[in-house]
Amino acid sequence: MTRSLKKGPFVANHLLRKIENLNLRKEKKIIVTRSRASTIVPTMIGHTIAVYNGQEHLPIYITDRMIGHKLGEFVPTRIFRGHARSDKKSRR
């Protein structure tokens, strides 16, 4: 189910404050956050946000094509190492 339009997108307050402060000063710093549920809004374009994946903070450069998506969509939390191999040779 999608979010109601009258509520607007969810963006963590601390993240929004940091981005607005950097936009006022016209600085480009890496913003470290754990808020994977925050929606990417147009004020974030051009910033690099390091999002926590459970082990480390992975930096993401925000572009205009990412608007409307969540930060967590761009940071994988699981590592796929491939399916288990079949042991047909050892069974013979």
From Swiss-Prot:
One of its GO terms (molecular function) is structural constituent of ribosome. Protein S19 forms a complex with S13 that binds strongly to the 16S ribosomal RNA. One of its GO terms (cellular component) is mitochondrial small ribosomal subunit. SUPFAM superfamilies: Ribosomal protein S19. Belongs to the universal ribosomal protein uS19 family. Keywords: Chloroplast, Plastid, Ribonucleoprotein, Ribosomal protein, RNA-binding, rRNA-binding. It is found in: Plastid, Chloroplast. GO terms for biological process: ribosomal small subunit assembly; translation. Pfam families: Ribosomal_S19 (PF00203). HAMAP family: Ribosomal_uS19. The keyword Iron does not apply. This is Small ribosomal subunit protein uS19c. The gene is rps19.
